Structures are given as C-alpha cells and as structure tokens.
Regions:
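Beta/alpha (TIM)-barrel catalytic core signal, keyed to glycine-rich beta->alpha loops juxtaposed to Asp/Glu
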Residues: 1, 6, 60-167
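Alpha-helix N-cap and loop-to-helix initiation/capping positions
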Residues: 2, 29-39, 66-70
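Solvent-exposed, non-membrane alpha-helical residues enriched in polar/charged side chains
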Residues: 4, 8, 38, 42-45, ...
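Short acidic capping loops at alpha-helix termini that bridge into adjacent secondary structure
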Residues: 11-14, 18, 51-55, 82-86
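Conserved radical SAM core fold
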Residues: 20-25, 116
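A short acidic, helix-capping loop that chelates divalent metal ions and anchors anionic groups
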Residues: 23-29, 146
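Short, acidic/polar
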Residues: 31-49, 91-99
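Active-site groove signature of glycoside hydrolases
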Residues: 45-64
Length: 167
C-alpha cells in the first residue's frame, strides 16, 4: 500500500515489479495454478492502486515448477487478462534459471549473484543475454555479510536463514 501511495503522489512514470507465490500454503508445485496465484495478483493490483503490474515474478517456486509448461501458461493467462504486462521468475539455482528461460515469454530472472556466488556468470548470464532476458541480482550483499556490519561473532535468531553458513 505504501508503494501505491507513492505511485499516486507523483506524475513520474513508475514501473512496478513484484513477486508472488511464496505465501502459498502449502508452498508446493500444485499451488502454482491460476486459481491460487490470481488472487495474490488481484490483491497486489488493489494494494498498489494500478490496473496492470509491469513485471510479476514467481518467487522461488518449487524446482519442478520451472519445467512445467502449465506454470507459464498460467502467467500467460494473467498477461491476456491485462493484469500483468510481463513476467519472470526468482530462482535459487542456475539450473532453475536455465530451465525457465526455455519458455519464450519469460522476460526476467532474479538470481543470487555476489562475490561468493559467481556460478551464474559461467553460463546463465551468456544464455540470458542471447535471449534478451533481464537479469535481476538477488542477495548482492550476501545477506548483509558484505556490508561490514557483521563479523565472526555475529549472532542471528534461530529462524534466520543466515544460520546455514555457520555450521
């Protein structure tokens, strides 16, 4: 809603990119269908106060979703309905990214890339460039590690995803 207020407050052209799917319960591949995803898109449209979302990304769906043509057909339906202009995916692995860009209407891929995670530069970036697919970098500061605000003694809450690096 805050972003929606910002959009209303300016005469400048603002392009909106958002993600959907992560709040599916349960979060599994079967949930990536029009009946489950469209209500999330509708809520985003309402909260943002826009008629169409410029870029809607699927937020790290289960791996099997990337090779399921129905996943992309669902997104194509949302484009046809005028609810989204373009769509992309947010991925965990290079393999998921390469699978997603096999589908012609995928316009962007959000992928982890930073000084510690360089694998996308080996193959994915080249393939994305060949297909003119936008790349959005995730976790560029390695979840805060590269900010200089953490050290070997930094402690995280028990449910903080950064704990996986400690062991």
């Amino acid at each position: 809603k805050f972003v929606g207020e910002l959009i209303k407050s300016t005469s400048e052209q603002i392009y909106v990119a958002t993600k959907t799917g992560r709040r599916l319960d349960p979060h599994n591949a079967d949930g990536y269908n029009i009946n489950q995803i469209e209500p999330f898109v509708d809520r985003s449209l309402l909260n943002l106060g826009v008629d169409c979302i410029d870029l809607m990304q699927l937020h790290c769906p289960p791996t099997e979703s990337y090779s399921n043509s129905e996943t992309y057909s669902m997104m194509d339906q949302l484009v046809e309905k005028g609810k989204i202009q373009y769509y992309g995916v947010s991925v965990e692995t290079v393999e998921e990214a390469l699978e997603a860009i096999k589908y012609p209407n995928v316009k962007s891929v959000q992928i982890i890339f930073n000084i510690f995670r360089q694998k996308p530069s080996e193959k994915f970036f080249v393939e994305a460039a060949k297909k003119n697919i936008a790349v959005i970098v995730r976790v560029p500061l390695a979840s805060g590690l590269l900010t200089g605000k953490m050290n070997i003694n930094s402690q995280f809450a028990s449910n903080d995803h950064r704990n996986y690096n400690i062991e």
